[in-house]
Amino acid sequence: MAFNRKQKLRDNIEAIRTAFILDRENRTATTEERAILQRYCGFGGLKCILNPAKELTDAVRWAKSDLELFAPTVELHRLIRENSKDETEYKRFVDSLKASVLTAFYTPKEITDTIADVLADYSVRPARILEPSAGVGVFVDSVLRHSPGADVMAFEKDLLTGTILRHLYPDQKMRTCGFEKIERPFNNYFDLAVSNIPFGDIAVFDPEFQRSDSFGRRSAQNAIHNYFFLKGLDAVRDGGIVAFITSQGVLNSTKTSVRDEMFRQAHLVSAIRLPNNLFTDNAGTRSEEHT
């Protein structure tokens, strides 16, 4: 089924509305509310939220192809404003959503389930699980099916997405901040790191990487996928597993310093090229990736 932008935007609005209600009423989600929260797909394929949408007159500044999304985008802004304590918080929520547009492409459940199933088939039963770019926790759900007693630490930088994640997994450590905020005591801590990590030439500043004697670690800060890979390797214990979906640039780049650093820290078990239309239905994007 093709990516339906209007339906995805509607799903996102209802999930955000539900999260605000749960916050306001200070309670856990019902089964029906969990289903609404789980339909949230992020805004990676919904660049319409970058357009002005505070007033009805803003419609004249929208492209004709996007006009069907104008009314729900106005509704989204109204919903966020009505549930913000002041204009500053409203702006923080909106700016955070807009910043996520470049990286918030969520993974089909069939893929996360398959990866979790393969790990289980090889008797990987992690007690401590890291998800460094969680979205609403599709990977978390998949791996917990096989390891229901595991402790999970997940990171989600976007404020509203992080709120939804927290309501979906109230008994786990869901952190609404960037992965670079993970503390040093969690180095060599996790049995498994699993994620569809963000990718692109987005820089990440990490003081530990900046001070490193390794050129590969310092240069990894220049591309977010390289940074996440090395930071994930740092967090996993000896004998642990990193299972990431990532950009083809990790293996195809002509610059080898980051790759050399990865192979210095870990052994490659498997690499699989995924079809470039795999994420079309979920995020409206085409990209060659690896896991």
Predicted regions and their residues:
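Conserved Class I SAM-dependent methyltransferase catalytic core
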Residues: F155-L159, A220-L278
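Conserved small/polar residues in nucleotide/adenosyl-binding loops
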Residues: E288-T291
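Class I S-adenosyl-L-methionine
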Residues: A2-L168, Q172
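Conserved proline-anchored active-site loop of SAM-dependent methyltransferases
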Residues: T112-R145, A154, C177-S212, N226, ...
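Glycine-rich, phosphate-binding/catalytic loops in enzymes
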Residues: S147, D171-Q172, F209-D213, R259-M262
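Short loop/edge segments at beta-strand edges and connector loops
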Residues: R175-F179, I272-R273
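Long, Pro/Ser/Thr-rich low-complexity/intrinsically disordered regulatory tracts in eukaryotic proteins
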Residues: G216-R217
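Short glycine-biased active-site loop of nucleotidyltransferases that positions the nucleotide triphosphate
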Residues: R184-F186, D281-T285
